[in-house]
C-alpha cells in the first residue's frame, strides 16, 4: 500500500515533498476530498427539512456520518454533536454546561499543559460565575504531577477539563485513572482528544469520560468540522 498516493497533495508537489506538521493540521485524504466533491456535485441540499430526493440523500449521509463517528468512539449516535472545531466543542460545554451548573467557590481543574482553547473558555466561566480555576502542575519531564492532582481533588471540584495528548510534547496523560478518581469524587471529566484521536483508540464507554472533543482537520478530514461527545443524560439536561 502506497500511503502517499492516498493524499492528492503529493501529486502536485515535487517528489521530495515531506510533510512534518501533522500535529498542527493533517493533509487531506482522498476519501474526504471525494466525499465533499460528491456532496457538492450530487446532493447539495439542506438536511432535516425537505422530502425531495437530494435533500433526503443529504440528510441520510449526514446522519450516516454521525453513526460512523459514534461507532468510532463506541458511543450512541444521540451523543454526538457536530461543531466547527474542537475549540467550539469546548466552548459549547463551557458556555452551556459550565454557565448553567457552576457557581461561586466551585472549582474547575485543568492542567498547565493545556492548549489555550482549553484555558480561555474556563477563565471566562470562572469570571462570570465566581467559580475557581485551578491548574494541575507539570513535572520537569513534561508529565502531569499526579500527586498534586490528587491533592487538588477536593469536594468543590465539579469539572476536570484535560488534554489527552499534549500538542507540544506528545505526552499522553493517564486519563482512565484520572477519570476513575474524579468520578469517585463526584466530578465530571471533559477530555480534549484533538491530538490523540488519530493515534490512540478511544472507547468512551471504557474510559467513562463525560465529555470528549476532537476535530476533523487533525485526522485527515476537512477544516471546519468538529465533534462533541457528551453522555446523553448530560446533553438532555443541558
Where are the model-predicted features located?
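Pyridoxal 5′-phosphate
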Residues: 1-238
